[in-house]
């Protein structure tokens, strides 16, 4: 009797516990399903609000054809970049710079720097106040050194166009110091006559010298513009899964492919690198080496021209995202199925080091500073865009500011050895092949 009673009690307890576990399991399942449903809805809302578009679409709204440079920013123009990671309005001043209004003549007792570069310097991924030039200017002024850092950057430019911009426009501002920001994709376009279909200037080599080969640059036929913002294509399947996959692809490619092997999604598809990326190839490829030869000649000419004006030239090396982030390098290797040793991540930087050493151009390498600044969930680069975010611009400005102090590349009133401004403001007239005041 006692045994039977005990068995009935144990059975009742087990039944209660079983029901409790079933209730708990049901709550877990319902919570998980609710989480997935809410996550899916949120993912679809986020994707629907993402802005698509191409760089050229916005750029066409504030640039114009230029017979020397191929294109330049229009005066007093504006356009808004709408991207998944940023929405930024770009405005130009009365001189066609993405900058505050600047007089051609430097203000009294003011140190003037001119920054030459491409989209990293123009900085269309961040507000004007957050660009590398404005952050550097703020640091100088906050330190007690009255300064102006002029933003001479234009998206899509390579070193040849930056050189020509200095000769035709930049020298007018009498900068004491000229900072040339150099990025890996500048190299190959030095030996090309168009940039993604848009004609650009071309130089020809002769006796290690460069000569402008084509003036005026051909004008690209105008395309019909659309005022509507381009939207991303609708997601097929789960939007939440697509968002997770996309972020793992770029941020944790090993995890992405591990889950792909389990059948959750397809592995990273194989692609072929564009010619411009072969500057990292371990082999010395002829088209790349020809472009490097032209880069050396253009840098030599720019240095001579800057010094003829009584200014100093320094080169600022911008590392590619994959040079700074291990995850980006892994994703690149998987995308192109690169074998070990096929590419050398240090090759571009090493080439730049040799060039600047040979030409006696001071080098500011941003690689160490940007690597040191990288933190989990606090990157210096945008995840999808590949340019700097506001933090990246600020870290770059900080590194340049530190170099200015340690190298004494400041005017005497700020503890350095440079003049406040250039001796000459003469510019180049390509139509006459002469200089004019």
Region roles according to the model:
Residues 40, 118, 162, 178, ...:
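Generic structural signal for small/hydrophobic residues in well-ordered secondary structure
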Residues 26-41:
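Hydrophobic membrane-insertion alpha-helices, especially the h-region
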Residues 1-20:
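N-terminal Lys/Arg-rich, disordered targeting/topogenic segments
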Residues 27, 382-424:
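Histidine-centered active-site loop/cap adjacent to the catalytic His
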Residues 17-19, 184-354, 358-361, 366-374, ...:
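Serine-dependent acyl-ester chemistry module
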């Amino acid at each position: 009797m006692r045994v039977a009673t005990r068995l009935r009690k144990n059975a009742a307890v087990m039944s209660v516990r079983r029901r409790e576990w079933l209730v708990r399991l049901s709550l877990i399942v319902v919570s998980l399903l609710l989480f997935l449903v809410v996550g899916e809805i949120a993912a679809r809302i986020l994707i629907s609000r993402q802005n698509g578009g191409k760089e050229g679409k916005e750029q066409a709204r504030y640039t114009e054809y230029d017979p020397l440079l191929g294109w330049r920013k229009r005066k007093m123009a504006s356009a808004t970049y709408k991207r998944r990671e940023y929405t930024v309005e770009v405005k130009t001043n009365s001189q066609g710079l993405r900058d505050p209004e600047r007089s051609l003549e430097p203000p009294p007792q003011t140190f003037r720097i001119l920054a030459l570069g491409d989209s990293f310097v123009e900085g269309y991924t961040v507000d004007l106040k957050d660009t590398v030039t404005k952050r550097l200017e703020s640091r100088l002024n906050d330190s007690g050194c009255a300064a102006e850092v002029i933003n001479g950057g234009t998206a899509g430019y390579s070193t040849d166009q930056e050189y020509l911009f200095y000769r035709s426009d930049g020298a007018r501002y009498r900068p004491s110091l000229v900072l040339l920001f150099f990025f890996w994709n500048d190299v190959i376009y030095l030996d090309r006559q168009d940039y993604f279909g848009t004609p650009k200037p071309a130089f020809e080599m002769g006796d290690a010298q460069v000569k402008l080969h084509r003036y005026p640059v051909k004008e690209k036929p105008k395309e019909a513009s659309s005022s509507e913002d381009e939207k991303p294509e609708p997601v097929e399947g789960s939007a939440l899964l697509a968002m997770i996959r996309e972020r793992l692809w770029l941020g944790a490619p090993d995890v992405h492919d591990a889950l792909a092997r389990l059948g959750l999604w397809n592995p990273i598809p194989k692609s072929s690198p564009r010619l411009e990326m072969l500057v990292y190839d371990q082999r010395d490829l002829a088209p790349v080496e020809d472009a490097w030869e032209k880069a050396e000649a253009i840098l030599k000419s720019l240095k001579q021209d800057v010094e003829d004006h009584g200014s100093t030239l320094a080169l600022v090396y911008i590392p590619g995202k994959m040079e700074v982030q291990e995850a980006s390098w892994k994703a690149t290797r998987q995308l192109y199925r690169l074998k070990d040793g096929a590419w050398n991540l240090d090759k571009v930087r090493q080439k730049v080091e040799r060039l600047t050493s040979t030409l006696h151009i001071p080098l500011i390498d941003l690689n160490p500073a940007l690597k040191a600044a990288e933190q989990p969930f606090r990157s210096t680069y945008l995840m999808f865009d590949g340019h700097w975010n506001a933090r990246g611009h600020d870290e770059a400005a900080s590194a340049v500011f530190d170099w200015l102090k340690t190298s004494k590349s400041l005017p005497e009133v700020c503890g350095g050895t440079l003049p406040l401004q250039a001796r000459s403001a003469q510019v180049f007239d390509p139509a006459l092949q002469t200089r004019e005041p």
